[in-house]
Amino acid sequence: MLSAAPKPTPQNKKQSFYNKLWCMVCRIQDPDIIEDYAKGDLICRGCGVVVGDRIVDEHSEWRTFSNSESTGADPNRVGGPINPLLRDSALSTTVGKGSKDSGTLTRLQNKSALGTGDRNLLAAFKEIGRMADHMNLPQTVQDRANELFRFMDDKKSTKGRSVDGMVAAALYIACRQEHLSRTFKEIAALTNVPKKEISRCYKIMKETFASVLNLQTISSEDFTSRFCSTLKLPNDVKKGAEHVSKMAMDMGIVAGKSPISVTAASIYMVSQLSPEKRTQKQIADVSGVSEVTIRNAYKDLYAKRDQLIPSDSPYFSQVQYLPTN
């Protein structure tokens, strides 16, 4: 008994943009469904019930056939995989090669096979893939960005907007959702889209998703590990910076400061206590915040330095030697 969840309503929009499989026995929100490719069955791992059978494999044919027949026919039984993000699921026919006029027919057929909307979506998805590859982002982030852009396109919110800007903003949100946060400056540097344009498109997307997505507040810990890695700082400095930034946020010392500036200031403070010192300029180049911003945040941390550095830390004895700014 295979069933799909109903289309999103104002009550369940927050869960997903697409239909999900549902086990009528377990009746849990996210059932653990596995697929038996040999038998074509969908099985609930929780209760063992077969929730679907005779499932058609929608992936591309993976076997390679030798073209030994004189007819020259292609024995592959399917084309590309179905793309659920396209309005017609990318199902279409193609003109085979053969006569001298087939090239013209193929171009005309490809132009008419997809509607204008789907052609625009395909172009956007291709750009998302290119940017994601350039940023070394995992497939999960790319898939999430595709979903976000498709949702915006359905809402007609992409009309009159910069496609590159909307794509970059979708990647920014997708990174946050997948706990791989990137700054606007990082996205701008890697996508060649102006920072202001990304910020503007992000605000538009955030307003559109206000009733659908819960964008969690960025924490300083989201950036500490990556910044320290780029600065080639040892693990003890990274852990110390994470502790300082968390304590500063919990104590309300840096109220009103952005998590990125707090992270940068925390890394600067702990690095000054260690043999692996880094300048404010070096940290500014990596974090994307100005040296002035780092200094202002550092002043707040410096005022409470004895409380931020634990007494059992190997760096505690060096607190008195911290620079004042």
From Swiss-Prot:
<feature type="repeat" description="1">
    <location>
        <begin position="131"/>
        <end position="207"/>
    </location>
</feature>
<dbReference type="InterPro" id="IPR013137">
    <property type="entry name" value="Znf_TFIIB"/>
</dbReference>
<feature type="zinc finger region" description="TFIIB-type">
    <location>
        <begin position="19"/>
        <end position="52"/>
    </location>
</feature>
<dbReference type="GO" id="GO:0005634">
    <property type="term" value="C:nucleus"/>
</dbReference>
<keyword id="KW-0862">Zinc</keyword>
<keyword id="KW-0677">Repeat</keyword>
<keyword id="KW-0805">Transcription regulation</keyword>
<dbReference type="InterPro" id="IPR000812">
    <property type="entry name" value="TFIIB"/>
</dbReference>
<comment type="similarity">
    <text>Belongs to the TFIIB family.</text>
</comment>
<dbReference type="GO" id="GO:0000979">
    <property type="term" value="F:RNA polymerase II core promoter sequence-specific DNA binding"/>
</dbReference>
<dbReference type="Pfam" id="PF00382">
    <property type="entry name" value="TFIIB"/>
</dbReference>
<keyword id="KW-0804">Transcription</keyword>
<keyword id="KW-0479">Metal-binding</keyword>
<dbReference type="InterPro" id="IPR013763">
    <property type="entry name" value="Cyclin-like_dom"/>
</dbReference>
<protein>
    <recommendedName>
        <fullName>Transcription initiation factor IIB</fullName>
    </recommendedName>
</protein>
<dbReference type="GO" id="GO:0017025">
    <property type="term" value="F:TBP-class protein binding"/>
</dbReference>
<feature type="repeat" description="2">
    <location>
        <begin position="227"/>
        <end position="303"/>
    </location>
</feature>
<dbReference type="GO" id="GO:0051123">
    <property type="term" value="P:RNA polymerase II preinitiation complex assembly"/>
</dbReference>
<dbReference type="GO" id="GO:0006367">
    <property type="term" value="P:transcription initiation at RNA polymerase II promoter"/>
</dbReference>
<feature type="binding site">
    <location>
        <position position="44"/>
    </location>
    <ligand>
        <name>Zn(2+)</name>
    </ligand>
</feature>
<dbReference type="GO" id="GO:0016251">
    <property type="term" value="F:RNA polymerase II general transcription initiation factor activity"/>
</dbReference>
<dbReference type="InterPro" id="IPR023486">
    <property type="entry name" value="TFIIB_CS"/>
</dbReference>
<dbReference type="GO" id="GO:0001139">
    <property type="term" value="F:RNA polymerase II complex recruiting activity"/>
</dbReference>
<dbReference type="InterPro" id="IPR036915">
    <property type="entry name" value="Cyclin-like_sf"/>
</dbReference>
<dbReference type="GO" id="GO:1990114">
    <property type="term" value="P:RNA polymerase II core complex assembly"/>
</dbReference>
<dbReference type="GO" id="GO:0006366">
    <property type="term" value="P:transcription by RNA polymerase II"/>
</dbReference>
<keyword id="KW-0863">Zinc-finger</keyword>
<comment type="function">
    <text>General transcription factor that plays a role in transcription initiation by RNA polymerase II (Pol II). Involved in the pre-initiation complex (PIC) formation and Pol II recruitment at promoter DNA.</text>
</comment>
<dbReference type="GO" id="GO:0001174">
    <property type="term" value="P:transcriptional start site selection at RNA polymerase II promoter"/>
</dbReference>
<feature type="binding site">
    <location>
        <position position="23"/>
    </location>
    <ligand>
        <name>Zn(2+)</name>
    </ligand>
</feature>
<dbReference type="GO" id="GO:0000993">
    <property type="term" value="F:RNA polymerase II complex binding"/>
</dbReference>
<dbReference type="GO" id="GO:0008270">
    <property type="term" value="F:zinc ion binding"/>
</dbReference>
<dbReference type="Pfam" id="PF08271">
    <property type="entry name" value="Zn_Ribbon_TF"/>
</dbReference>
<dbReference type="GO" id="GO:0006352">
    <property type="term" value="P:DNA-templated transcription initiation"/>
</dbReference>
<dbReference type="GO" id="GO:0097550">
    <property type="term" value="C:transcription preinitiation complex"/>
</dbReference>
<feature type="binding site">
    <location>
        <position position="26"/>
    </location>
    <ligand>
        <name>Zn(2+)</name>
    </ligand>
</feature>
<keyword id="KW-0539">Nucleus</keyword>
<dbReference type="InterPro" id="IPR013150">
    <property type="entry name" value="TFIIB_cyclin"/>
</dbReference>
<dbReference type="GO" id="GO:0032993">
    <property type="term" value="C:protein-DNA complex"/>
</dbReference>
<feature type="binding site">
    <location>
        <position position="47"/>
    </location>
    <ligand>
        <name>Zn(2+)</name>
    </ligand>
</feature>
